[in-house]
Regions:
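Small/polar-rich, solvent-exposed N-terminal microdomains that initiate assembly or binding
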Residues: 1-63
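A generic structural signal for short beta-strands and their flanking turns/coil linkers
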Residues: 45-49, 71-75, 120
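Residue-level recognition of well-ordered beta-strand positions that form the cores
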Residues: 52, 78-80, 123-127
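A common structural junction motif
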Residues: 95-104
Length: 139
């Protein structure tokens, strides 16, 4: 596994640990497949926190250009909950976690009422270098 492929699972592990430490127990996933969602795309268990790294872009090339030195990582977090207050609490906790990992917030979290559940979506972005131990080694 390349160093940049470790970013998503390590972010998920860090956020999951932080949320559970505060007494919440949502389902965490990095995949929204048929084992997690119903035919309408809604998670079968609420609340669910979906954490996914969008396709990263290479940054920080050197003159040799023989290896990937850094990537611009964008993490999307979607929170599905049937309780508005719970969704807002999870939003605040996940935002705090991402700021502690030094991510910027190019898209502030937005919560919408989807009828049977509330959906909060946020995106976080930062440059991660091959030597950034906080996101590459096990947290």
């Amino acid at each position: 596994m390349s160093w940049y492929e470790q970013i998503e699972p390590n972010v998920l592990t860090y956020v999951k640990y932080s949320v559970e430490e505060l007494g919440y127990s949502p389902r965490f996933t990095s995949v929204l497949d048929k084992t997690v969602v119903d035919d309408n795309g809604v998670p079968k268990k609420l609340p669910t926190v979906y954490i996914h790294m969008l396709q990263p872009a290479e940054v920080g090339n050197d003159l040799d250009n023989t290896e990937i030195n850094g990537v611009l990582a964008t993490i999307e977090i979607q929170i599905f909950s049937n309780n508005y207050n719970e969704s807002q609490s999870l939003r605040t906790i996940t935002l705090d976690c991402m700021k502690k990992l030094r991510f910027n917030v190019p898209m502030l979290p937005v919560t919408t009422n989807q009828g049977d559940y509330f959906l909060t979506i946020a995106r976080y972005r930062r440059v991660v270098g091959g030597g950034d131990s906080d996101l590459i080694t096990e947290l």
